[in-house]
Amino acid sequence: MKLSLLRHGEPVGGRIYRGNQDDPLTEKGWQQMLDATQNQSWDLIITSPLLRCQSFAQHLHQQQKSSLEIVDNFLELGFGDWQGQSSMQIGQDLVDAFKLSPIENKPPNAEDLYDFQHRVLNAFKIITAKKSNSALIIAHAGVIRVIKSYLLNLPIEKMFTIDVLSASCEEFEI
């Protein structure tokens, strides 16, 4: 199966720890995603239910006439008390500590990283068991980091060493 992982484009509200906050894409975010998927097609499109992913997935689904699945387990990591705040509001030292050691330094009231990994990979394994020639997962940086960590055999504690830019699209053969 050809598997593509696409992070959503720029959302309304700027660079914050958004988590499950349901912000739509900006015009720039839409254009980023159009550019990232230009001249490509997939048999199956899988998306997070959040607007910044699902709205574009619906558009692509209608355009390509491909199958579409909305997967709740592809929601972004819940950032607890950090949700809706920028790195500057949180404190760069706390953000750096979290990225370096996310198990020991998780944000207050945040989702457990192992629970997050478990829910994402459960959904991912169901998807990869499907008989599809090509699939596109439209999701969030955290979800994509978990999947890439799994595919690259990296421990989940190292997921923040993986860069996932807005509207970046990577392809894997699985």
Question: Where would I find each of the regions flagged by the language model?
Answer:
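Domain-level recognition of soluble alpha/beta enzyme cores
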Residues: 152-174
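General small-molecule cofactor/ligand-binding pocket signal
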Residues: 4, 69-71, 173
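Short beta-strand scaffold positions
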Residues: 47-48, 118, 138-139
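GST superfamily/GST-like fold recognition
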Residues: 141-145, 168
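Generic beta-sheet signal
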Residues: 3, 131-142
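Glycine-rich phosphate-binding loop signature in dinucleotide/nucleotide-binding domains
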Residues: 39-41, 127-133
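Phosphate-handling substructures
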Residues: 24, 62-121
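Active-site-proximal alpha-helix that buttresses catalytic centers in soluble enzyme cores
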Residues: 2-64
